[in-house]
């Protein structure tokens, strides 16, 4: 099953953060914050503009992104967790 986002929305899968601090201390699940990094799984066709045109999105499938702590809406599909968010909620693309 797939999610096909509409307009300027993107579907993101969270990427797990390191569970060890820089000093080598293991961080338990209860103390760890939800990661704010993710991989774009699916993108909508683009943002509708006032003049009727559609502006394509700046992100594409496979991009690794940074997003805010409260960005988007969490959804579960076939046992997997995703976040559906607007492109405006994305802070940046991580370039490799």
Swiss-Prot record:
Q: Which Pfam families match?
A: Cpn10
Q: Which GO terms describe its cellular component?
A: cytoplasm
Record flagged with keyword Protein biosynthesis? no
Gene3D superfamilies linked to this entry: GroES chaperonin
Q: Does the keyword Metal-binding apply?
A: no
Cellular localization per UniProt: Cytoplasm
Chief subcellular location equals cytoplasm
InterPro entries, from UniProt? Answer: Chaperonin_GroES, Chaperonin_GroES_sf, Chaprnonin_Cpn10_CS, GroES-like_sf
Q: Which GO terms describe its molecular function?
A: ATP binding; metal ion binding; protein folding chaperone; protein-folding chaperone binding; unfolded protein binding
> How does it associate, per the subunit comment?
Heptamer of 7 subunits arranged in a ring. Interacts with the chaperonin GroEL.
Function noted in UniProt: Together with the chaperonin GroEL, plays an essential role in assisting protein folding. The GroEL-GroES system forms a nano-cage that allows encapsulation of the non-native substrate proteins and provides a physical environment optimized to promote and accelerate protein folding. GroES binds to the apical surface of the GroEL ring, thereby capping the opening of the GroEL channel.
**What protein name does the entry list?**
Co-chaperonin GroES
């Amino acid at each position: 099953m797939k999610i096909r986002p509409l307009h300027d929305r993107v579907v993101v899968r969270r990427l797990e953060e390191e569970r060890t601090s820089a000093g080598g201390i293991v961080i338990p699940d209860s103390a760890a914050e939800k990661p704010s990094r993710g991989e774009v799984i699916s993108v909508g066709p683009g943002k509708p503009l006032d003049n009727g045109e559609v502006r394509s999105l700046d992100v594409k499938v496979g991009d690794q992104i940074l997003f805010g702590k409260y960005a988007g809406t969490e959804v579960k599909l076939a046992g997997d967790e995703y976040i559906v968010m607007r492109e405006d909620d994305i802070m940046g693309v991580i370039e490799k």
